[in-house]
Amino acid sequence: LANSRYDLAVIGSGPGGYVAAIRASQLKMRVAVIERDLPGGVCLNWGCIPSKALLNSAETMEAIRGAGKEHGIEVGEIKLDFKRVIARSRQAADKLSKGVLYLLRKNKVDYIEADATIAGPHTVALRPAAGKAAPPAEAVEAERILIATGSGEKLFPGMALGDGVMTSREALLHDRLPKSIAIIGAGAIGAEFGYFYQAFGAKVTIVELEPQMLPGFDAEIAEELRKSFVKRGVKVLTGHGFKSMAREGEEWTVTLDAAGAPKTIAAEAVLVAVGRNPLSLDMGLDAAGIEADRGYVKIDDSFRTTCPSIYAIGDVARPPLLAHKASAEGIAAVEIMAGVREPGFDLLSIPGCIYCEPEVAMVGLSEAQARERGIEVKVGKIPFRANGKAVAINQTEGFVKIVAGKEYGDVIGCQIIGHHATDLIAEIVLGRTLETTTAELGHSVHPHPTLSESIMEAALAAEGEAINF
């Protein structure tokens, strides 16, 4: 290793880095992946996977609670072992993390445990990572370098973690269920953990500075989720900014700013979910003349940075901060390097998903965004209460909304809130890739009874041809 030179050195083994490395190896490149933490990065170990395991436990709890009332299945006293809930999520993360290491080795990618910094256009310096053995060399040389370091949790200035104050990372390990929790931020992380904690009986208050939950999402979707959360007993405070917090006895007193008027709430625990920062600091960007904007590494349409031999993908390069976007960018970047793909990447075709219940999914432009761009649109909207499968399984919350071009019916965007929304959105993603129209979607026969029929029905609604609503 000390004397070897790679075609590509990838810094970070998350969903962007490990996928890029494997694709590069398939394209006959000699590849090394450098990781300072665990194989799979944040997504597999501290994000997507363990959090979905927790949400599955929450859904199971809700199903058990409703078994008698909904299905006539009486159960005895429900006992919760919250430590096992957390342990199960860690097992899922550990299993997939080991799977990533296996895939890298299977594809002949060298995996190096080290803390990496860029020392030049073709050099990555290696240092011992925290808690890890010394790396096998002091540096790695590569024809090209790919930065895939991801992002980290954002905190308010001066805020210290511990004593019940957490980000999502700490929450994934916190094996004592708080009686009450204040969640600062009503984006994807805030919504998912809000649902999780309320399902297990915690008193949940979600605080959001913006006037709606899920800032940036379709307003109708956000309002539907707010109503669902309130119905479940979650207190949602939109238009409230965080000011300060202080420990008082067994609880935290959180002071908020509501249009200039102070307001306080008390909670045993506080979860900070106000976004993430790209992990580009202390990376040695200056050593290779790499420019960044607010921490995001600047890239062109080939994912190349301001240093011609160094590329960047995923959270460290640009929003949206999504694992599947990082993976897709990783594949695109190495294929462009190999000359088998043209530059360019369609960010509008990247779906965004939130895995609380009801689930939320979107792709493309919302109705408001399309109109702001001067696009004439037609909209088809179908509630799940008009869907036979949804009624049969008692999952009638939410709706499907398809936004299409007025003249040709080209699918501009879709927003879904409801059961399995995050699975249903894939049909629209494929449709956008194939430049499908609402007429084509609506006239494609969907199996009955399925939730996917709501996609067909919403497409028909956009054409003025809805049958079941």
Language-model-detected regions and their locations in the chain:
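Glycine-rich flavin
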Residues: A2-Y6, I22-M29, I34-L177, T205, ...
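FAD-site-proximal beta/loop scaffold in flavoenzymes
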Residues: G162-L177, T264-G339
